[in-house]
């Protein structure tokens, strides 16, 4: 199946900009990754270029020549990130590459609490072409949670139909804001700055863990990322 992908790591040692804002009794630290340059990137089985896409500076993540139709993914890990609880927000734009098979959806998403170079990770991702489909069942599968290594999307769908995926309006190729709030074993996914989450997970499969943060896309996706922040 196309979504049972072999995730290929692409290391992204991005420039880290840290700002601190003070509240009445606590401090909130924000780490910003502009994702606007290829400088300092270590690439594995992928290519990355810095471009301007739909009015934003961004990185374009894609497969190596000859791998455009493979059932693989490129993952970009944010070097130096160590995340347990908090908020991750990033701008993404994804759509199937021209000529991709009709059952491909433009898979694109965020990994968090990443360990062992992606062997373990929590994952929220989008299926952009499902968001405005005329097929209601496809619309219900617009966003997805999964967890590596033991809980891929198809196992979760079989064992708990409708629990780990949901509908949200998505426009393929358009900039989309993904925000994930994580606390302990719970996580919430928000799209395009909505006040309410489109997907709630109350039992993250890796438990109350920690690890790195990454962005990823399927080899058949035209994928763009910009302005990632961690709070």
Locate predicted features.
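Bacterial N-terminal signal peptides
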Residues: 10-19
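Extracellular glycan-recognition regions
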Residues: 24-231
């Amino acid at each position: 199946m196309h979504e049972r992908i072999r995730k290929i790591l692409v290391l992204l040692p991005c420039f880290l900009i840290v700002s601190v804002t003070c509240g009445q009794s606590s401090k909130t630290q924000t780490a910003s990754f502009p994702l606007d340059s290829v400088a300092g990137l270590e690439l594995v089985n992928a290519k990355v270029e810095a471009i301007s896409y739909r009015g934003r500076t961004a990185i374009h993540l894609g497969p190596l020549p000859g791998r455009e139709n493979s059932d693989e993914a490129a993952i970009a890990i944010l070097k130096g990130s160590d995340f347990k609880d908090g908020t991750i927000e990033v701008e993404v734009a994804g759509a199937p590459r021209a000529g991709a098979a009709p059952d491909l959806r433009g898979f694109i998403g965020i990994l968090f609490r990443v360990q062992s170079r992606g062997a373990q990770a929590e994952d929220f991702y989008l299926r952009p072409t499902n968001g405005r489909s005329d097929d209601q069942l496809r619309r219900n599968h617009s966003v997805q949670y999964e967890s590596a290594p033991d809980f891929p999307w198809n196992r979760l769908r079989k064992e708990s139909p409708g629990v780990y995926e949901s509908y949200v309006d998505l426009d393929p190729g358009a900039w989309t804001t993904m925000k994930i709030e994580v606390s302990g074993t719970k996580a919430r996914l928000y799209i395009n700055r909505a006040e309410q989450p489109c997907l709630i997970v109350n039992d993250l499969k890796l438990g109350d863990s920690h690890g790195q943060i990454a962005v990823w896309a399927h080899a058949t996706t035209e994928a763009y990322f910009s302005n990632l922040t961690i709070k």
